[in-house]
């Protein structure tokens, strides 16, 4: 163990030097008394003188060392006092009793555990955010690629726009006053054509059905998939709605004003053909001679001379449903004005067009109704209708009122082009006359005043 630093060693060293110093002070050897016998050093005088000389030589150095040790002791005492004061201050500040130490350790442990849990949560959150950042970076890169692709497409479209526009729908060049006129001019293909009836201010587009015999039918109604909602207002039925296609595979209503202009334009009357198809693929037809639709001033009234034949039967003449003796009379359509939900012209105290969801030549209400609601599968019931009425696409003389057709077509042709098939009537004697309340309607050319589209 080193004696240089430990306070206890310094104290011992100090007392040893003090003892020697006191001895030297008690007896200082000189040349005069060197040989005087001194009983403390025995009988050998020279030895006593040697010790005296030795002590005399080192006395000054010892005094310096003593002074230095005293200074060090004072410093040690000062430091010791400071340490004691510091210990006392620490004890005053923090001096738990033995019983509280376990609780404090537990509290510190719990606090450490919570801190670790928080650290783990932050680490997990950092990992989650890193994952989100990577995901967003991927989306950002993907969107940048999409933007590049869109810019390329825009550039392609801009290049295409520099070229002259071309119609993607084929519209034939031949025009006429109706589709039969177009067929007479040499048209052989069914499709879209412009016609301009004699009293029309401008031409309009129609779908012409041209057969191999040179018959040109002007189609004004088509149902085939339920893609078009036929619950429209008066203006929409007047102008027409739906879509015309070159292949005749879209639903539409040509427009009451156009039907009126076509069907009343010449002395040659028109014939109406109704084509029906059920959900089993069976088809049937019904033909009506001298068909026409009046002007808007007369609410686009429907009239015809007689039923010209067809296996679908004459639903326009009404049908006896067995509900009332007057069923047939109040479900006939000849002479009826056109009705829509916002323009009621029927014979019913209610509104047939509103309750049946369509526009039609309503009586009270109908036996044939080709603008009705499109029911998938055909069969429907009172429970499936909003008001419990037969509102489907019906033709009561071929199917029941609770069977809705899959496909229908209404088209007209000049009466002299009507093909006479097996079982069809073609004689005026079998004509069914118009209701007595409208006797003038049998005169085809004199009923309507001149009017324009």
Swiss-Prot record:
The keyword Disulfide bond applies. It is found in: Secreted. One of its GO terms (cellular component) is platelet alpha granule lumen. Residues 1-26 form the signal peptide. One of its GO terms (biological process) is cell-matrix adhesion. Glycans are attached at residues 78, 334. Changing residue 327 to H: In CAFBN; hypofibrinogenemia; heterozygous; no effect on fibrinogen complex assembly; no effect on fibrinogen complex secretion. Changing residue 303 to P: In CAFBN; hypofibrinogenemia; heterozygous; no effect on fibrinogen complex assembly; impaired fibrinogen complex secretion. Changing residue 401 to W: In CAFBN; hypofibrinogenemia; heterozygous. Gene3D superfamilies: 1.20.5.50, Gamma Fibrinogen, chain A, domain 1, Gamma-fibrinogen Carboxyl Terminal Fragment, domain 2. Residues 400-422 are annotated as: Gamma-chain polymerization, binding amino end of another fibrin alpha chain. One of its GO terms (molecular function) is extracellular matrix structural constituent. The modification Sulfotyrosine is found at residues 444, 448. This is Fibrinogen gamma chain. It comes from Homo sapiens (Human). The gene is FGG.
């Amino acid at each position: 163990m080193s004696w240089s630093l430990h306070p206890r060693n310094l104290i011992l060293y100090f007392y040893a030097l003090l003892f020697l110093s006191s001895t030297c002070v008690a007896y200082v050897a000189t040349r005069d008394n060197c040989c005087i016998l001194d009983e403390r050093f025995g009988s050998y005088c020279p030895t006593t003188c040697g010790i005296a000389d030795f002590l005399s030589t080192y006395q000054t150095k010892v005094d310096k060392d003593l002074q230095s040790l005293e200074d060090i002791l004072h410093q040690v005492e000062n430091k010791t006092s400071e340490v004691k004061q510091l210990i006392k201050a620490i004890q005053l500040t923090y001096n738990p009793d033995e019983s509280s130490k376990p609780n404090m350790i537990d509290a510190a442990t719990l606090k450490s555990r919570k801190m670790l849990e928080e650290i783990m949560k932050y680490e997990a959150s950092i990992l989650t955010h890193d994952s989100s950042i990577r995901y967003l970076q991927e989306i950002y890169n993907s969107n940048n690629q999409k933007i590049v692709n869109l810019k390329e497409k825009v550039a392609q479209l801009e290049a295409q726009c520099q070229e002259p526009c071309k119609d993607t729908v084929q519209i034939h060049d031949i025009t006429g006053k109706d589709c039969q006129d177009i067929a007479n001019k040499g048209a052989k293909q069914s499709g879209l054509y412009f016609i301009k009836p004699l009293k029309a201010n401008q031409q309009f587009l129609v779908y012409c059905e041209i057969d191999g015999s040179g018959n040109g039918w002007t189609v004004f109604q088509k149902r085939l998939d339920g893609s078009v909602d036929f619950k429209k207002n008066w203006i929409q039925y007047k102008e027409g709605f739906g879509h015309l296609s070159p292949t005749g595979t879209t639903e539409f209503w040509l427009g009451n004003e156009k039907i009126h202009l076509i069907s009343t334009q010449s002395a040659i009357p028109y014939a109406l053909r109704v084509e029906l198809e059920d959900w089993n693929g069976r088809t049937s037809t019904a033909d009506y001679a001298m068909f026409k639709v009046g002007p808007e001033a007369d609410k686009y009234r429907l009239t015809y001379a007689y039923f010209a034949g067809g296996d679908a039967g004459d639903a326009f003449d009404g049908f006896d449903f067995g509900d009332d003796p007057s069923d047939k009379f109040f479900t006939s359509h000849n002479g009826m004005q056109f009705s829509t939900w916002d323009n009621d012209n029927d014979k019913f105290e209610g509104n047939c067009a509103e309750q049946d969801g369509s526009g039609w030549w309503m009586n009270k209400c109908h036996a044939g109704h080709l603008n009705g609601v499109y029911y998938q599968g055909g069969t429907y019931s009172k429970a499936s209708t909003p008001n419990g009425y037969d509102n489907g696409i019906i033709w009561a003389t071929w199917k029941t009122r609770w069977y809705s057709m899959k496909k229908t077509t209404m088209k007209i042709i000049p009466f002299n082009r009507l093909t006479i098939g097996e079982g069809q009537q073609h004689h005026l004697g079998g004509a069914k006359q118009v209701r007595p309340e409208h006797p003038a309607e049998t005169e085809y050319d004199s009923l309507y005043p001149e009017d324009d589209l």
